């Protein structure tokens, strides 16, 4: 019983409200539906949610404890890319969903310091998205774009 209580109290509490709102996507969505804006802030270490994602990529950066965006996928997507555009600032991404244990993390995209995640098998459900920076408390305006392939 003590082990169960310890596990429950050690698990980070993830909020169901997002700093910049919720957006829903279905197949063949138009680019405007998959484009949202926000800004980074906070000194919450994203590695507190998970040190590594499902592909063993490091989860790094600092953000607000609440997710920045909640994305609801109304259908399964075989392939998607989620890209941050902060005009070249050093950003990171952490996406949790559709369950509590599926984590995807992203950092630099090619020569760009902005983060992206390109992955397969996005299941129908709710995804919590954090956009972070390497420096705690850094405020960077960004556009987040979701593209289906």
Describe these PLM feature segments.
Residues 76, 87-89, 96-100, 134, ...:
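Solvent-exposed coil/turn segments that connect beta secondary-structure elements
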Residues 56-66, 107-110:
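Extracellular beta-rich ligand/substrate-recognition surface
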Residues 2-3, 13:
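Cleavable N-terminal signal peptides
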Residues 9-16:
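Sec/Tat signal peptide C-region and signal peptidase I cleavage site
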Residues 16-56, 65-69, 124-149:
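C-terminal edge strands of extracellular/lumenal beta-sandwich accessory domains
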Residues 94-145:
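Noncatalytic accessory or regulatory domains flanking protease catalytic cores in secreted, cell-surface
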Residues 63, 67-78, 118-123:
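Extracellular and analogous surface-interaction loops
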Residues 70-86, 93-94, 127-131:
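Hydrophobic beta-strand segments within beta-rich accessory/binding domains
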